[in-house]
Amino acid sequence: MGIFSIANQHIRFAVKLATAIVLALFVGFHFQLETPRWAVLTAAIVAAGPAFAAGGEPYSGAIRYRGFLRIIGTFIGCIAGLVIIIAMIRAPLLMILVCCIWAGFCTWISSLVRIENSYAWGLAGYTALIIVITIQPEPLLTPQFAVERCSEIVIGIVCAIMADLLFSPRSIKQEVDRELESLLVAQYQLMQLCIKHGDGEVVDKAWGDLVRRTTALQGMRSNLNMESSRWARANRRLKAINTLSLTLITQSCETYLIQNTRPELITDTFREFFDTPVETAQDVHKQLKRLRRVIAWTGERETPVTIYSWVAAATRYQLLKRGVISNTKINATEEEILQGEPEVKVESAERHHAMVNFWRTTLSCILGTLFWLWTGWTSGSGAMVMIAVVTSLAMRLPNPRMVAIDFIYGTLAALPLGLLYFLVIIPNTQQSMLLLCISLAVLGFFLGIEVQQRRLGSMGALASTINIIVLDNPMTFHFSQFLDSALGQIVGCVLAFTVILLVRDKSRDRTGRVLLNQFVSAAVSAMTTNVARRKENHLPALYQQLFLLMNKFPGDLPKFRLALTMIIAHQRLRDAPIPVNEDLSAFHRQMRRTADHVISARSDDKRRRYFGQLLEELEIYQEKLRIWQAPPQVTEPVHRLAGMLHKYQHALTDS
């Protein structure tokens, strides 16, 4: 396909984006807003942002959710801006510096919260800065400006949502149904690979792909939840299916690992059974029915615990899958499955990364302030706003450098494009609202095509062009003001990019070590006799950390295997029949404290000391288990865990 060709699937969203821009423009001028540009800019960003992220037309609910986050972020930013102005209006320089710190603080929070919700915090950071900078000439108009800004943004969001609803947004439900069927087949095929005990790299690739697909299914669940309240029952089932899918992966991989030391546990009966190939979910359904009969015939005691647990989880998965596809009322059996264990939320392992983002945003905003004050440039304030926007939005994404480059390309492209609109198109449409709407619709349509193709600079060009063309009420055409605004955007993006390059993010290795130690802590915490603690569901949180590890260290198989082994150890120890007595309970608490010290240690020496202490305690614990005559279901997983920690001691303690 050529660079200038238009794919059919991209046309509908391009029309949707053009409609959102035209609606916001018409409403803004109809209600005599002072700066309809903010409404148009908001409509464009809210509509185009999800499309750029998705690489195509976003699914139903995505634009509404982004608009909701933008409203929240704007209100938080406006309130923060008002508080800062009221408290420090007599010290303008201090007021701007506090705003720079506020932008950094919001970026820090956005780096720690869920990626879907981080947009609101990033927006809150630079909204306060925009308000403080804009009201510098007339501070007494701050409340009026804050109210107007909120009103214009809400109008833009409503217009984007109306355009989304007008052009029948895509539902993700069919994609979810197809993925549920396909995922079940892939789970069965993974178990086949693990029972065959073939090439380790093939197995690693298979379970790695399944972890990614399960994580993607969880993202689809979020989209389905945003789409409509009628999918509430399907959403509950999908949440449970996420845990079941992760359980299937864990049991399959444990089956593979068990055969490294005790291959005789998997009998020929099960090896022959899993030799039968499957292609569809219907094939898996038939095989599971036969497998349940085989287990009933051989008996639970003669069935390996991993296969027994896998079949139980696959059966529940099938039951809930049918409920998701049909979206029928939840029956008693399903309700029993859905009333599962409470999920545990794990502490973020990216605190150091978040602090780097804080300093990047704060320093870039302070650098912009110094540049503005030193040069006295009339558009220095515009450069500062772009610095805050780029750093606040770039820091929460995996590759901030590329986001900054995208903004630089976008602002450079906006200069000639904005010049065309400022000098030729808009002056010639002054007498006709219809012509003005058509001209902006054409801009939105073609940039909407480019945004869906993720063309470098397309998103930045859309926002930057709308920001510099004259869409105020009344319109005034001062070329020097236009040029200042356009150059201010470019300079701001370049300064932000410079700070991102200078303030290096070297937190990757530290994050990886913290993640691995969190896996160790989870495995140690599973050794408990506390009933409430044993019922906690750590699996989604553990696999979320594993997914982060896979993204941070692509292709690092030893790290993935170590993390997966810790997850398997956690699941096995969680179900192990540990003898109940005060001596072991007290020692469990001691080991958990030591594991927490390993995670929180700030130096390598302390970390090694606490890790060595943990290894010694595990040796003592194994001796205690022998004294209390614990069964092999307890002693064997503990012995395997201690062996793994001894083997990977340096990887878990050294920076």
Curated annotation (Swiss-Prot):
Subcellular location, record wording: Cell inner membrane
UniProt GO MF annotations: transmembrane transporter activity
GO CC, alphabetical: plasma membrane
InterPro entries membership: PHBA_efflux_AaeB/fusaric-R, PHBA_efflux_pump_AaeB
Keywords assigned: Cell inner membrane, Cell membrane, Membrane, Transmembrane, Transmembrane helix, Transport
Spans traversing the lipid bilayer: 13-33, 38-58, 69-89, 93-113, 121-141, 152-172, 370-390, 407-427, 431-451, 459-479, 482-502
UniProt keyword Transmembrane helix present: yes
Family, as annotated: Belongs to the aromatic acid exporter ArAE (TC 2.A.85) family.
NCBIfam families cross-referenced by the UniProt entry: PRK10631.1
Function: Forms an efflux pump with AaeA. Could function as a metabolic relief valve, allowing to eliminate certain compounds when they accumulate to high levels in the cell.
HAMAP family for the chain: AaeB
The protein's name: p-hydroxybenzoic acid efflux pump subunit AaeB
Annotated organism of origin: Shigella boydii serotype 18 (strain CDC 3083-94 / BS512)
